[in-house]
Each structure stands twice: as C-alpha cells, then as structure tokens.
C-alpha cells in the first residue's frame, strides 16, 4: 500500500532538491534525514512503532490528555494496515528519492535551458522532459518497490506478533509461507513459493512494459523515419 505515495513524494522531493533555481538551503541535511530511516533495521523500526502506537503508548496518552478515547491501532484493520503502510513508506522513500535524484541530475542541463528559453514553464519541463527521460529509473523503482511489498515479512510479523491480526487481515504471503515452513508442510510452502514467483514476475513485467511503453513507441517511430 505504501509504494504509491512513496513514489509520489520521492519524485516531488527529488525534483525540488535538484532544482537549482529554488536555491534550497541545508539540502544535504535534509537528504541525510530522509535517508536515515533506511539505515534502521526493520525489526527495530517495528518495535518502535509497536511501543508508540500500543494501547498504553505515547500516542494514546496524547489522545487521552485531549479528552479523546483510546484508539486500539493494532486491533483495528485500518489501524494495523495503516501502520504497516506508513512504516514501509518511511523506511524506503528516502532510498527512492536518492535514486530518482541521481536520474534527474544525469539529465543534460542544456536541454532544460533550451526549453526555458523557448518559454516552457517548470511544470511543462518536468512533464515533457524530466519524466520521459527518467522513466527507466522509475520503472526500476516501481518494480523493486512492488517486489519488496510482496516479500514483506519482518514489519507485519513483529507488529502483529506473527498472527497477522486483526483477523489475519495483515498477514502477508511470506508470513503465510513461513507458517507452512515452521509446521514442516514443505509441499504447500514450495507450491506457494512458485505461485509467488509467477505473480511477482507477471506484475513486474506488466509494470515495466507499461512505464516504458512510450519509450518503445518513440524509438519505433524514430527508426521508421530514419529508414524513410
């Protein structure tokens, strides 16, 4: 759930940090801050969130001090799923931002200067120049984020005590696979592994083809014009 806002905010931050006209201060500090969660172990991050959002945690203490009732984040479907998505977002959007920044910084500045001279706005430059050029990098980040989401295990495992509560609505495919391995049901675990591989491969190919479709079409048109 978290990789969609992750891509949006990462792309937004990457465009801000690489825009020299904004003259943002302390960009190095902010880059370090947004990347820091990526360096924290997922298990430690999960325990931190478990403590903060527990029934007697700081968040509920704050709600009680404001006269609001205790909200059982880990006992509600929306609460548990929302926390997992938030943790996944915080842990990985910094890495995605750095990757997208590298792609944007690799664009020839002369192209953008020429577009500005021709009267293009910043939004037009971003939509017509930046996005098409970094599409391969976006495809890479989307595919890796998709695979990471399918393979998610440690965060929901720790946050829900391995049960995927409430009512197994937070149980991931890898948690289900791990339960079969733990119970020595190797046949079911092997079948599930193959199914996960097929699903991952199909979705990855679909995302990559969809994102890079315009590039292939443009290349084909250019090739036809060259032959003529």
Question: What is each PLM-predicted segment?
Answer:
Residues 1-228:
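A structural signal for multi-pass alpha-helical bundles of membrane permease subunits
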